[in-house]
Amino acid sequence: MEFVKSADVVVIGGGIVGTAVLRELSKYDLKCVLLEKEPDIAIGTTKANSAILHAGFDAPTGSLKAITNVRGNALYHELQNELDLDIKWTGSLVAATTDEEMQTLQELLQRGKKNGVEGLQILSKEEVLEQEPNLTTVKGALWAPSAGVCWPFGAAIAFAQCAVQNGAEVIRDCKVLGFVKEDGKITGVETNKGTIAAKYVVNAAGVYADEIAKLAGDDTFTITPRKGEYILFDKTACSSLVYGVVFPTPTKKSKGILVCTTTHGNTFIGPNANEQDSKEDKAVTTTGMNEIIASAKKLIPNLPMGAAITE
């Protein structure tokens, strides 16, 4: 087998996870290579999400997600200083509009405390309106001061640039086709740009992680794509709709349609959450838009839809 290059670690996937892993590994005396199938990094899920640095109150206590969420939130404070990341620590509100939802907030409060989230408190309607005057329908809210919003695209680029400065390599337009194995162990990664020898492989391929795993002989899981749609508002016409992150009270399906202001000053509403077969279908639908608007209006009845960006 002829290898075009060799690496100690090959990271598959150039999103926020893959680039963060690459940066961390690049701190050590290792030859690290990241493979990204697209023309640039961070143009998959990383570029199209709510960009929230969650406080950590929602995940089940004791779960890996709960542990890493709280730890990750703290790490981003350090990363912001180290890499000059674009982050605004706005805090988040989980808004309740019914007595039943107020009870759910109490459950989230207790779970958050068990998870180690600091500063959580239940706010009255009056206290909520002091922070977010447009939330006129709320009865109260759970306040999480440690939450924030970031610019994920910029964060992934910062991770990758730092890793490259440390000696790592990023190869774009590089699709993984298979793996070389010896005695049941992966020793190389086959790509459209040749085969790379590898001692270790990190699968950070996002919604395609199951397909990469199958190429390696692991068929223990599958990923069902779930698409979320958003509506983005013009910041010049809608600059003070909300200050920070506003969630509705969550359901078993999702955290719900939220209202949030990005690090660049635009407000958005969304996303919905619809499972689909395609991993590439990013179409925005009329049904989806209507769903988002109706849900967001439960929190802010007077949404300025004339300020929505449509082109």
Name what the model sees in each region.
Residues 20-26, 53, 84-88, 178, ...:
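Active-site substrate-recognition segment that forms the wall
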Residues 51-131, 256-257:
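Dinucleotide-binding Rossmann-like beta1-alpha1 core, especially the glycine-rich loop
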Residues 17, 40, 208:
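Conserved Rossmann-like nucleotide-cofactor binding loop
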Residues 26-47:
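Glycine-rich FAD pyrophosphate-binding loop
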Residues 142-200:
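Helical element adjacent to the flavin cofactor pocket in flavoenzyme catalytic cores
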